[in-house]
UniProtKB/Swiss-Prot annotation:
This is Ribonuclease P protein component 4. Its cofactor is Zn(2+). The lineage of its organism: Archaea, Methanobacteriati, Methanobacteriota, Stenosarchaea group, Methanomicrobia. Its EC number is 3.1.26.5. It comes from Methanoculleus marisnigri (strain ATCC 35101 / DSM 1498 / JR1). The keyword Nuclease applies.
């Protein structure tokens, strides 16, 4: 019984920490992109350690191949093509495609 409350409490704390790290990544990016990439790396590791998913809006802020924090216009190109938003990471060239239009059911 105590393990389940401890586990849920640590997961809640991990979610908060991940949100703080992504906020810090956005804050650090103009001065130090390497530091913001490190924040993304730490957030991913916390999520894996506690087996929690990173929320969709946060997940779309970094490249899935090189784990670079993405800022449109700076190190990411954003285009709309055939009903999808295509985000290209300018560090590694990886393209992420996200559907636009109908909401998910």
């Amino acid at each position: 019984m105590a393990d389940t409350t401890r586990k849920s409490g640590s997961r809640r704390l991990a979610r908060e920490r991940i949100a703080v790290l992504f906020a810090r990544a956005a804050e650090f990016y103009p001065e130090s992109p390497d530091r913001s990439n490190r924040c993304v790396e730490l957030a991913r590791k916390i999520g894996m350690r506690h087996r929690i998913r990173i929320e969709r809006p946060l997940k779309r802020r970094f490249c899935r191949r090189c784990y670079t924090y993405l800022v449109p216009g700076s190190n990411a190109r954003v285009r709309v093509h055939r009903g999808r938003v295509v985000v290209t990471c300018l560090a590694c060239g990886h393209r992420s495609r996200f559907p636009v239009g109908r909401p998910r059911q």
